Amino acid sequence: MLHESGIELRSSPRLAVDYPTVFSGDKLVGEGTITNLSVPGCAIRTSKHLKEGDYLELRVLMPDRQAPLAIDVAKVRWIANGSAGLQFIRVRPEDQLRLAYHLRLALHADS
């Protein structure tokens, strides 16, 4: 999120990724690619028609080769150029911990 001054206001670091995902919503099932990931949300690239305000359930294939990361409820916050920004609304505690651990390791490795 950008402030009118152009300064980034994000409180959580984002990790650029290329993780396959499957998702479903009200009368919608699709596939996509997560292009950036943070604890509170992600950006997804997909050919499916999503709308702001849609609610989705996601399963993200993580590089650790364990079971897919489960995001039980995510809300579409923005749409632009074939991508959508999702806010995670409900994530199981074990998946929340796994996501935070994965991000901490990956972001630490980049620094």
Where does each model-flagged region fall?
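Structured alpha-helical
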Residues: M1-S111
